[in-house]
Amino acid sequence: MSDAAFDSVSVNPPANGAGSGDDFSVPVPRPKTSIFKLVGEVLDHGGPGYLQFAITNICNADCGFCGFARSQFDPKKRRSVTLQEAKDVIDIAVRNHIGYLLFVGGEPLVHRDLRAMVRYAARKGIKPMICTNGGLWTEENMKALASDGLSSVIMSIDAHDIAAHEKNRGLKDVCAKIRRANEFFLSLGVQTTASITASKLIEDYDKLPAFLESLGFENCTFSYPLTDLKSSYLSFSEGGLVSFTKDELYEVFEKIKRMKHRSGYPVVNPTESLDEMQRHLRGETEQFGCLGGFKYFYLDWHLNLYRCHFWETPMCNVYEWDESKLVRDGCTRCMIDCYRDPSVLQFVAVSVMDTWKALKQGQFLRAARHVFDRRNLTSIKAVAEDFKWVTKV
């Protein structure tokens, strides 16, 4: 499918909101959470959860390390959720204490109802976020989504120069679109983040900060390379770009840490999480079990809910999702950054919840164990490290 064909189905609903029951001319404010509400959420359920919602498996890009690539994906398997399904998901997510909803794909901007989904989430008090390759940005859809309550944008970056990035993505002039998107969203206070796949396309990590700044990014996060996923999610590849030996991958994490500390450029991945992934590679005991299935979730275009991208079997269909389905078993099977990194950051909030519940049950020794767990300090340090980014999401 050509870029022109994708443009025809990108975010462009009728101006009057026909067919969605919404008036798109009326702006929706970005959701905000008061400190008092946040404290209550932490005590009650460990703080707001996070849902990655793959609203489509269609993508306009042709990345060399992704199963969603347009040249690899079977057109007969294309599937997108309906607007009504998305609204149902958002209602269910609210009941399950989700505070952040990240729309992913495929490429979420190909979905014609993305605006309506973002608006509905924002009205329900969930912070809507978009993860995109940036190839379908237009002045029209940027302005539209900003007025729909969009909270944050994540855009993919693969290399430290334009030619290498655009060649891998198969998207001509995408860097110019990304630069313009950063300029536009930052002018409105909508946070943008570069999501960098740690692949062999990156020849020199020290060149990344200047390149990111040239595109208008003020921070970045690294996606750890994935060569196999057990769920329906296809953002992985067995190919050479993301295929590393354990020793090579260990050194990749060293390079990320060195870049982070030498340059001072804001890297969202907590240092402790990078250390944790190195412990994982060495087969050492890991300090922070993953909160996937308890605070973080992946939902696919079939509405099957997984604890993360890696897991083989769904927890349940989204319509069956309730507290009884939650899993908290300290899993350390994988190295997926969007579950492992926040598990370090949110550890202290979940510890506060555990302490509070133990106190209410009169279990004072158990409460004390949670309070004096050394990992609380490590988690607090990670939050302090990412404080500016966390408060803007």
Predicted regions and their residues:
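Generic structural signal for helix capping and beta-alpha/helix-loop junctions
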Residues: 73, 110, 138, 162, ...
